[in-house]
Curated annotation (Swiss-Prot):
Transmembrane portions of the chain: 4-24, 35-55, 66-86, 107-127
Function: Fluoride-specific ion channel. Important for reducing fluoride concentration in the cell, thus reducing its toxicity.
Superkingdom field: Bacteria
Gene behind this protein: fluC
Protein name: Fluoride-specific ion channel FluC
Length: 133
């Protein structure tokens, strides 16, 4: 039961961060691309890469892991919204914008997971066995 409370708390914080990123991403950018969702997903990719390394190195408790990964990052990132927005762009005839959203989200997402993990490994001074290094 306590684990569910940690997930709910992390989820609340992640959702608030996602909303904040969506608001910030709208400032000065053209509404042709769903910038808020893209920003949330890319920030989440970076965070999950780095925090996964730290969790392995410092043996985060199960409660802390579900708070961060299931609750926080799980509610910050949003695959379903990303998929819907990409589909809507395609259905509106904005094929290049839709395909660019898919390509940028996936390629930069993978790159940012790797960069986040690399940053954490650098800060730790080397490979972390539990991360597969």
């Amino acid at each position: 039961m306590l684990k569910l409370l940690w997930i709910a708390l992390g989820g609340s914080l992640g959702a608030l961060c996602r909303y904040g990123l969506s608001v910030l991403a709208r400032w000065g950018l053209p509404p042709t691309v769903p910038w808020g969702t893209l920003a949330a997903n890319l920030v989440g990719c970076f965070l999950i890469g780095g925090l996964w390394v730290l969790a392995a190195q410092y043996s985060f408790s199960e409660e802390l892991r579900v708070f961060i990964f299931t609750g926080g990052i799980g509610s910050l990132t949003t695959f379903s919204t990303y998929s819907l927005e990409s589909l809507l762009l395609l259905r509106e005839g904005r094929v290049w914008a839709g395909l660019a959203n898919v390509l940028v989200s996936n390629v930069l997402g993978l790159v940012l997971v790797a960069i986040g993990a690399g940053c954490a490994l650098f800060l730790l001074g080397g490979p972390v066995a539990a991360f597969g290094a």
